Amino acid sequence: VLREYVVDPFEIMRVAESMAKPVHPLPAARKIGEAVAFFTAPEAPHGQPPSRHKSYPVVNEANGLIAMVSRADALRWMVSGWDSEKTLGEQLLGQNLLVGHEDELVGKLADRMAEADAGRVPILRRGATDEESTVVGLVARRDLLRVRAQVIRHERDREQLIRLRGTAGARGR
């Protein structure tokens, strides 16, 4: 009897191996209007990274995570209007955030994302205190699917190799 045991990569891979990086957080002091322009501009303003993600971490002066802001937030503010003097930090204060850590297992984070129906999660490097933790990446559902797709490709390649070996062995008899 031949039995194969498969190791689930979600249970051995660390988040650091699957997260998108580098992260370009937005400062909490940025005005709402500037954030709307960032998300809606066809090209990035001079000296800034292009808005290629759907959401970004918002950090304080000490680079501590305080919120996440999304393109959907910016579009909602465009439609409903916004206080031109309000900052991202003021607008997003009290946001309930799901975070991950770079040393965490991908499977644990995927479970928490599924339970919270979270599409994107900021990833932190652990500091001595929560305030000292810094944002080092983002994990989106597509990053988790990429891990799963890699496993499927490896399994398909392995099956083809086994079939080829079986065919070669049958010819030699």
What are these regions (language model features)?
Residues 66-74, 136-144:
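Short hydrophobic beta-strand motif reused across regulatory alpha/beta modules
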Residues 1-27, 151-173:
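Membrane-interfacial segments at transmembrane helix termini in multi-pass membrane proteins
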Residues 10-20, 29-35, 84-92, 103-109:
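Short, structural beta-strand-to-alpha-helix junction motif
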Residues 58, 64-65:
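Anionic-ligand-binding alpha/beta catalytic cores of soluble enzymes and soluble regulatory domains
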Residues 56-57, 69:
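ABC-type nucleotide-binding domain
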Residues 95:
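A conserved mid-domain beta-alpha-beta active-site/ligand-binding segment of alpha/beta enzyme cores
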Residues 26-52, 59, 76-81, 99-127, ...:
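The conserved cystathionine-beta-synthase
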